[in-house]
């Protein structure tokens, strides 16, 4: 049996996950005495597009800030170095929101050429337009949102849990590769790499054979 029930974003007011992801696999595992690990390892992304509409939050990538977009408070003032790590920027935004009694801050693209916005960030541009904000002319409201769950059902390097013949893959699992704060674009490790390792183990592939093939593919 393989558990692949995703993360826990549906438990949060703002999340880039689908609302249906509510940690069901964790609940099943806990009820059967399967070990869970690092349930407090939750990554919050600093900039999701603020919206009063229910459902999944739209993520505005760090690359926008890398191109020159800056965070502003309600007075139009910068309050943080936008290129600091996600958790640091998130904390700064939360602090500013609390200070101002606001439910969002602003992301200004004023320093980003319009051509760059349209060519490099067309999806962001279109999503902001849907909410009524033309980021070539005005800032867009943003708010931190739950983005990734590094904790989960404890698994080994073949995605085996502490229960015989039970595996967990993807975001519902915790194999330790992400530590406490996942690096951007690394989520496929659990979804693809460790899922493939689990499939190999289930199929009866010998550990030594698998490791040999793995080493050859990586280093040969």
Task: List each model region and its residues.
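An anion/pyrophosphate-binding glycine-rich loop and adjacent beta-alpha core
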Residues: 28, 34-140, 192, 201-207
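A conserved FAD-binding loop/helix module that cradles the flavin
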Residues: 11-32, 163, 175-202
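Short hydrophobic core segments
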Residues: 1-6, 29, 167-170
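Long, amphipathic alpha-helical stalk/connector segments used for oligomerization, subunit docking
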Residues: 204-220
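Short secondary-structure transition/capping segments
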Residues: 48-53, 148-150, 180
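A glycine-rich dinucleotide-binding beta-alpha-beta segment and adjacent secondary-structure elements
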Residues: 120-173
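Glycine-rich nucleotide phosphate-binding loop and flanking beta-alpha elements
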Residues: 8-10, 43
């Amino acid at each position: 049996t393989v558990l692949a029930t995703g993360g826990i974003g549906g438990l949060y007011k703002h999340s880039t996950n689908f609302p249906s992801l509510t940690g069901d696999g964790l609940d099943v595992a806990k009820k059967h005495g399967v070990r869970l690990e690092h349930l407090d390892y939750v990554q919050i992304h600093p900039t999701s597009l603020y919206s009063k509409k229910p459902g999944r939050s739209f993520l505005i990538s760090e690359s926008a800030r890398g191109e020159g977009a800056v965070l502003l408070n309600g007075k139009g003032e910068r309050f943080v170095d936008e290129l600091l790590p996600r958790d640091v920027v998130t904390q700064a935004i939360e602090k500013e929101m609390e200070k101002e009694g606001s439910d969002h801050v602003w992301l200004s693209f004023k320093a980003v050429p319009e051509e760059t916005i349209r060519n490099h960030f067309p999806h962001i541009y279109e999503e902001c337009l849907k909410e009524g904000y033309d980021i070539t002319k005005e800032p867009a409201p943003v708010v931190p949102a739950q983005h990734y769950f590094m904790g989960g059902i404890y698994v080994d390097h073949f995605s085996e849990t502490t229960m015989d013949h039970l595996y967990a893959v993807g975001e519902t699992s915790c194999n330790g590769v992400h530590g406490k704060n996942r690096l951007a674009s690394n989520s496929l490790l659990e979804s693809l790499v460790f899922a493939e390792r689990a499939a190999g183990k289930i199929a009866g592939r010998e550990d030594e054979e698998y490791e040999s093939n793995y080493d050859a593919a990586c280093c040969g």
